[in-house]
From Swiss-Prot:
Keywords: Cell inner membrane, Cell membrane, Membrane, Symport, Transmembrane, Transmembrane helix, Transport
Biological function: Responsible for the transport of dicarboxylates such as succinate, fumarate, and malate from the periplasm across the membrane.
Subcellular location, record wording: Cell inner membrane
Name of this chain's protein: C4-dicarboxylate transport protein
Transmembrane segment boundaries: 8-28, 44-64, 76-96, 144-164, 184-204, 222-242, 289-309, 326-346, 352-372
Organism: Pectobacterium carotovorum subsp. carotovorum (strain PC1)
Coiled coil: none
GO cellular component annotations of the record: plasma membrane
Family membership noted in the UniProt record: Belongs to the dicarboxylate/amino acid:cation symporter (DAACS) (TC 2.A.23) family.
Topology within the bilayer: Multi-pass membrane protein
InterPro entries for the chain: C4_dicarb_transport (IPR023954), Na-dicarboxylate_symporter (IPR001991), Na-dicarboxylate_symporter_CS (IPR018107), Na:dicarbo_symporter_sf (IPR036458)
SUPFAM superfamilies: Proton glutamate symport protein (SSF118215)
GO biological process: L-aspartate transmembrane transport
Signal peptide: none
Length: 430
């Protein structure tokens, strides 16, 4: 029994994170030098994301009996994303107004170092609905795969899947080749995931070594407020949605515990995207639903990022004594409903969207970003974890609503009684 525990990815990643924290705290300079380990692991994952999405979406769509179901799945997913992310934005807004973590700080924006956030404000200037939509269309298919742009690859994969489906029997050879290639790709993923503990160790050692635990204490009220809000959102909002759909949020979290630990170590929900595609299909969701919902959710269903954006914006207003009446806050909410859709599931994207939002709202000092620059990295974990759980729940909800969910398989997997699949899960172990 002990041997199996030590061999599990869950234990290995947890141990790696703990060792990384200790190294970063007691030997900060050495901890900072571990950064390449975390970066290298994330780059390996990003290397494989584009082909995984392409294969999953193409085989999922091409293998469907009716094309109408694809359009229905997409429409249901987008509607769900909009409703739940709006709830997340409102919850963040309500909590930050009640707790007021920035009240009493009385900071003069002119004394803040705006140069520290210049790189984010520059990137934020490129944010906007039209540029975002235009960016979804790749200049070339090769460019989409080379850059690893999730939405560009998704767009091409959907079009390719539709075209392959229309070929019917003539396209069977191509379908079989892509399906076989998909199995090879997931074999590569299993190899990469063996390095997950090393990546989590390096990323955590760097974070603690560079920013220090002291940074957490300085603005601890905002961090604590944000983490508690994320927990409440997961168990109250997502938990209620899960219960209404027919499964337990607690069992689902246990089911993806290894992925959650990897995200905790790397601060990027994108680092487990390939594994989530595999696990959501294993839990009973049709491949076509998984292939559409998960990749799209990485831009349109970022619940943790939505909570962070409203809380951070109002915190800056409170700390700098920038008055925000109810109309200002409604304006902020409307702007975030659009700008939050441009955030990807990668570290730092939420900060860029926040910079864009402050610029768009106008009366909030963009220089106020310097206040949370030091602690943004520590809030990134909660954002990524909430985003991951949110996308997983969304996939099951959409699959059930579209009648593309095997509920018996869902119950068996979440209860741990599906022996055949559990036996196959050593891909995530040893």
């Amino acid at each position: 029994m002990k041997t199996s525990i030590f061999k599990s990815l869950y234990f290995q990643v947890l141990a790696a994170i703990t060792i990384g924290i200790l190294l970063g705290h007691f030997y900060p300079q050495l901890g900072e030098q571990m950064k390449p380990l975390g970066d290298g692991f994330v780059k390996l994952i990003k290397m494989i994301i584009a082909p995984v999405i392409f294969c999953t979406v193409v085989t999922g769509i091409a293998g469907m009996e009716s094309m109408k179901s694809v359009g229905r799945t997409g429409a249901v997913a987008l509607l769900y994303f909009e409703i739940v992310s709006t709830i997340a934005l409102i919850i963040g807004l309500v909590v930050v107004n009640i707790v007021q973590p920035g009240a009493g700080m009385n900071i003069d924006p002119s004394t803040l170092d705006a140069s520290a956030v210049a790189v984010y404000t520059q990137q934020a200037s490129q944010q906007g609905l039209i540029p975002f939509l235009m960016d979804v269309i790749p200049a070339s298919v090769v460019g989409a795969f080379a850059s690893g742009n999730i939405l560009q690859v998704l767009l091409f994969a959907v079009m390719f899947g539709f075209a392959l489906h229309r070929l019917g029997a003539k396209g069977k050879v191509i379908f079989d080749v892509i399906d076989s290639f998909s199995k090879v790709i997931f074999g590569v993923i299993n190899m990469i995931m063996k390095l997950a503990p090393l990546g989590a160790f390096g990323a955590m050692a760097f974070t603690i070594g560079k920013y220090g635990v002291g940074t957490l204490v300085q603005l601890g009220q905002l961090i604590a407020c944000f983490y508690i809000t994320c927990v409440l959102f997961i168990f109250l909002v997502l938990g209620s949605i899960a219960k209404a759909t027919g499964f337990s949020i607690f069992k689902f979290i246990r089911y993806i515990r290894e992925e959650l630990l990897i995200v905790l170590g790397t601060s990027s929900s994108e680092s487990v995207l390939p594994r989530m595609l595999e696990k959501m299909e294993k839990v009973g969701c049709k491949k076509s639903v998984v292939g559409l919902v998960i990749p799209t959710g990485y831009s349109f269903n970022l619940d943790g990022t939505s909570i962070y954006l409203t809380m951070a914006a109002v915190f800056i207003a409170q700390a700098t004594n920038s008055h925000m009446d109810i109309w200002h806050q409604i304006t902020l909410l409307v702007v975030l409903l659009l700008s939050s859709k441009g955030a990807a599931g990668v570290t730092g994207s939420g900060f860029i969207v926040l910079a864009a939002t402050l610029s768009a709202v106008g009366h909030l000092p963009v220089a106020g970003l310097a206040l949370i620059l030091g602690i943004d990295r520590f809030m990134s974990e909660a954002r990524a974890l909430t985003n991951l759980i949110g996308n997983g729940v969304a996939t099951i909800v959409v699959a059930k609503y579209c009648r593309e969910l095997d509920e018996k398989k869902l119950d068996a997997e979440l209860s741990g009684t599906n022996k055949s699949d559990n036996a196959a899960t050593p891909t995530a172990q040893s």
